Amino acid sequence: LTIALTATGLASATLVSLFAINKVIGKIATSKDLLNTRNKEIFNWRFGDISYSVTGEGKPVPLIHNLKEDSSSIEWSQIIPELSMNHTVYTIDLLGCGLSDRPDMICTSFMYTQLVGDFVRDVIKKKTNIVVTGKSAAFVLEACSNEPDLYGDLILINPDSIRNFRKAPSKRTKTAVFILKLKIIGTFIYHMMCRKKKIYNYFEEDGFYDKENIPEA
């Protein structure tokens, strides 16, 4: 009984500490307001509100960001000014990313395929070219295949293999999902995966050819 009480006490203390750490990290991470809400619009999608912005005039071009733990529409911030000179540029935060809703559910590639199609159909409302990067390329290709009349030219930037998105979840994946859905523990793991040093290491090793082009945050 004593051992059980001690273990319970240690577990509780650990969770309290992680909760406090999460609060501090969250406050520091949002202090610069990098994901500001200015000029943002909301697409009331059936699985949650989707944040997006519209810039410029001309042929429509939605920009679909990568699907990593630290991804959001801010990835496109360096090219929007030039691209918007001749296009209507739509930058979207995918469900669970940026300023969009984070529903208590597992977001699948099929769900993102539906999101892209619904956004083009209900918000843009005309045939559009589309630009996508990284892991998101797979479900955008699926969306284009489902409704080819909605899309014109498609630009893929560093696309991941479509085969990776057709794999069934393994037991290891299901265990990881269970742990990540434990709010305090999952949030702490997310913060560790998205810490500034880790992001900059990715930029230096894989993200940028020229390190001098890495933006300061």
Where on the chain are the PLM-derived regions?
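Active-site signature of alpha/beta-hydrolase-fold catalytic machinery across serine-
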Residues: 78, 142-146
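Alpha/beta-hydrolase fold catalytic core
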Residues: 1-61, 87
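Active-site loop/oxyanion-hole signature of alpha/beta-hydrolase fold enzymes
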Residues: 91-131
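Conserved HGGG/HGGXW glycine-rich cap/lid loop of the alpha/beta-hydrolase fold
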Residues: 53-99
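Gly/Ala-rich beta-loop-alpha elbow adjacent to hydrolase catalytic centers
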Residues: 131-140
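Conserved alpha/beta-hydrolase catalytic His-Asp/Glu region
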Residues: 166-167, 190-217
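Flexible "cap/lid" loop of the alpha/beta hydrolase fold
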Residues: 145-146, 151-184
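Conserved catalytic-core motifs of eukaryotic protein kinase domains, centered on the activation segment
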Residues: 73-75, 100-106, 165-168
